[in-house]
């Protein structure tokens, strides 16, 4: 230790000697070069890998030199808070929660036991649109959302215009409605048909009814019907399929019966639009606009505020990536951005009136959300293949320039998100597409800022240089020499070996062509 201190104390005197300075430089260069060699050899990386193997994993990983795999998770706790939501506990108990912080909810139960005495009930037929709200007793008259929810559920479950059984409403019990599912007909075939219709309506209402009533069948014998082009299948050895006799709706308090799912809210809202829209698709006049919270143009892109994402902060997405939402409508991320932007800007003039918000969103969600994407993901969920729940999205980010791809939905399988290795081909393709897009954009930018005449001049000058370089390497003969004679310059000999000035006056001497003197 004393030698080291003495070395640093005598450092000024040492530097005074030129030889010592040279030795110090050589030592520093050797040490730095040795460290670089050790790093390039991979020895340090091997030790780091052995120490951290199985103990540490990074949530982000590099793709090549500059591209990084990243993700974002949307937070829906404050989104669509003015709309009811639904969830399912099992195949018999389902719940609808009121909007915001309200305490009321509606319990939907499938059972084989009746809870209403028909002699003390008021019959309300399904064909009458508004009579279902007469079943709501002792409920705050100002709470129109419950009546809206009841009407939506009623129209979705009991399709108007068909021969369906009446419903029973219990008096003096707040909300208690009973659907008799066995009164449609005595024949089992028609009851099964009605049961399938009911399940279809419930699945559209609840959204997440993947395996609540349906499972799989080991055999399905199908054959064409006589005098018809229809195919009839007889399923056997089926598991998990059952029917119930009664459907009960009753009011309840919300006690976190099950986990909230924002997709169920979207399904619920879109189920009511189905009563007025025959087909649902994105309208041609709707385009994605890049704007900030005040509605002004936002050339830099679109930013999700702190309330819209899981982690605290603001996440911005570039104009180049977000603008792709105008090119096609096959991105779940674009649909979520439209919903967030609509929720933040379009309803400010409604003075936070939940019913007005709900009515407006119900009428416009048809143009905000792609029903084709919802249907595709619902079919994927039913078929037990990875599907999108519109919550977590991944994208490729270029750490050098900040450019990134349009976020893609992180698919779910068996209740959990897929591992990154399961869709490796997809994010590698996105990375290559980002490289291609950046190179193309850089090429177009350079082409736009460079005059075409300058490009032509550069091309022809380069061609001229290559040609002259070839001529320089080959060389051309410049004058004649007399064999075995000195250079006759500045005289210029003819093929006979003479010069007109008379200096070389004897003709007939042999001559040869030579190149210019170097």
From Swiss-Prot:
| Disulfide bond sites | 87-258, 303-316, 325-334, 388-409
Question: Which parts of the sequence lie on the Extracellular side of the lipid bilayer?
Answer: 2-17, 59-456
Quote the residue positions with lipidation, kind N-myristoyl glycine: 2
So where does Zn(2+) 2 get bound? 479, 481, 487
Q: Where are the transmembrane segments?
A: 18-33, 457-477
Q: Which domain of life is it from?
A: Viruses
Please tell me one Gene Ontology term that the record gives under cellular component: virion membrane
Q: Which InterPro entries match?
A: Arena_glycoprot (IPR001535), Arena_glycoprot_zinc-bd (IPR043015)
One Pfam family hit: Arena_glycoprot
Presence of keyword Metal-binding: yes
Q: Which residues lie on this side of the membrane: Cytoplasmic?
A: 34-58, 478-518
What GO molecular function annotations does the UniProt record carry, in alphabetical order? metal ion binding
> What residues are glycosylation sites in this protein?
90, 112, 127, 180, 251, 389, 397, 414, 419
Q: Which family does it belong to?
A: Belongs to the arenaviridae GPC protein family.
Indicate what this protein is called per its UniProt record: Pre-glycoprotein polyprotein GP complex
The species this protein belongs to is: Oliveros mammarenavirus (isolate Mouse/Argentina/RIID 3229/1990)
User: What is the gene name?
Assistant: GPC
């Amino acid at each position: 230790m004393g030698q080291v201190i003495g070395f640093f104390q005598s450092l000024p005197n040492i530097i005074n000697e030129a030889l010592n300075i040279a030795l110090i430089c050589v030592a520093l260069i050797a040490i730095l070069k040795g460290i670089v060699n050790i790093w390039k050899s991979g020895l340090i990386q091997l030790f780091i890998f052995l120490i951290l193997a199985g103990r540490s994993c990074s949530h982000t990983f590099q793709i090549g030199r500059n591209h990084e795999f990243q993700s974002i998770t949307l937070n829906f706790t404050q989104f669509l808070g003015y709309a009811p939501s639904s969830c399912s506990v099992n195949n018999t108990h389902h719940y609808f929660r009121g909007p915001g912080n309200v305490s009321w909810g509606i319990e939907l139960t499938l059972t084989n036991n009746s809870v209403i005495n028909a002699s003390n009930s008021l019959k309300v037929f399904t064909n009458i649109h508004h009579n279902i709200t007469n079943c709501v007793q002792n409920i705050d008259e100002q709470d129109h959302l419950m009546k809206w929810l009841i009407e939506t559920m009623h129209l979705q479950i009991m399709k108007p215009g068909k021969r369906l059984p009446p419903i029973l409403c219990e008096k003096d019990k707040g909300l208690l409605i009973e659907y008799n599912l066995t009164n449609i007909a005595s024949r089992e075939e028609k009851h099964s048909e009605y049961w399938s219709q009911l399940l279809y309506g419930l699945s559209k209402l609840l959204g997440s009814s993947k395996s609540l009533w349906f499972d799989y069948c080991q055999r399905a014998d199908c054959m064409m019907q006589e005098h018809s082009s229809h195919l009839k299948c007889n399923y056997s050895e089926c598991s998990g399929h059952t029917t119930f006799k009664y459907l009960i709706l009753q009011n309840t308090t919300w006690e976190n019966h099950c986990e909230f799912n924002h997709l169920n809210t979207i399904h619920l809202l879109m189920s009511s639009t189905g009563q007025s829209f025959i087909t649902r698709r994105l309208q041609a006049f709707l385009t994605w606009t890049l704007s900030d919270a005040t509605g002004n143009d936002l050339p830099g892109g679109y930013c999700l505020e702190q309330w819209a994402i899981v982690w605290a902060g603001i996440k911005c997405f570039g104009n180049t990536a977000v603008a792709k939402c105008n090119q096609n409508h096959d991105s779940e991320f674009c649909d979520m951005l439209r919903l967030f932007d609509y929720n933040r800007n379009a309803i400010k003039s409604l003075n936070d009136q939940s019913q007005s918000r709900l009515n407006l969103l119900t009428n416009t969600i048809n143009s905000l959300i792609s029903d084709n994407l919802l249907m595709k993901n619902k079919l994927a969920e039913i078929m037990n293949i990875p599907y999108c729940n519109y919550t977590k999205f991944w994208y490729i980010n270029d750490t050098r320039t900040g450019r990134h791809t349009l976020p893609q939905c992180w698919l779910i399988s068996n209740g959990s998100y897929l591992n990154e290795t399961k869709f490796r081909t997809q994010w590698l393709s996105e990375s290559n597409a980002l490289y291609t897009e950046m190179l193309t954009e850089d090429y177009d930018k350079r082409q736009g800022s460079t005059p075409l005449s300058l490009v032509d001049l550069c091309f022809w000058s380069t061609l001229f240089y290559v040609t002259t370089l070839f001529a320089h390497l080959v060389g051309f003969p410049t004058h004649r020499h007399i064999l075995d004679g000195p250079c006759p310059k500045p005289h210029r000999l003819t093929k006979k070996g003479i010069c007109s000035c008379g200096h070389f006056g004897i003709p007939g001497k042999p001559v040869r062509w030579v190149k210019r003197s170097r």
